[in-house]
UniProtKB/Swiss-Prot annotation:
Heptamer of 7 subunits arranged in a ring. Interacts with the chaperonin GroEL. This is Co-chaperonin GroES. One of its GO terms (biological process) is chaperone cofactor-dependent protein refolding. One of its GO terms (cellular component) is cytoplasm. The gene is groES.
């Protein structure tokens, strides 16, 4: 993906969610909720503070994050793939291996 995030923006590719229940039933429609985990594809330079300094972001390319999938998260097709553009504050946690 050839894209660069600006300022405190993060671009995330949503991870696929399991479409079968523990009992092997295939989930469809509203039962198959969208995943709120994804891989960070690009990050901006950081948040610009009131004093003009730039605070680097806590996430880096390749991190797996849990994110808030609500207002302010923009879905965009980039190179025929869905990518989510969000503020770094929409990321709730980094999943560590």
């Amino acid at each position: 993906m050839n894209i660069r995030x600006l300022h405190d923006r993060v671009i995330v590719k949503r991870k696929e969610v399991e479409t079968k229940s523990a009992g092997g039933i295939v989930l469809t429609g509203s039962a198959a909720a969208k995943s709120t985990r994804g891989e960070v594809l690009a990050v901006g330079n950081g948040r610009i503070l009131e004093n003009g300094e730039v605070k680097p972001l806590d996430v880096k390319v390749g991190d797996i994050v849990i994110f808030n999938d609500g207002y302010g998260v923009k879905s965009e097709k980039i190179d025929n793939e869905e990518x989510l553009i969000m503020s770094d504050s929409d990321x709730l946690a980094i999943v560590e291996a």
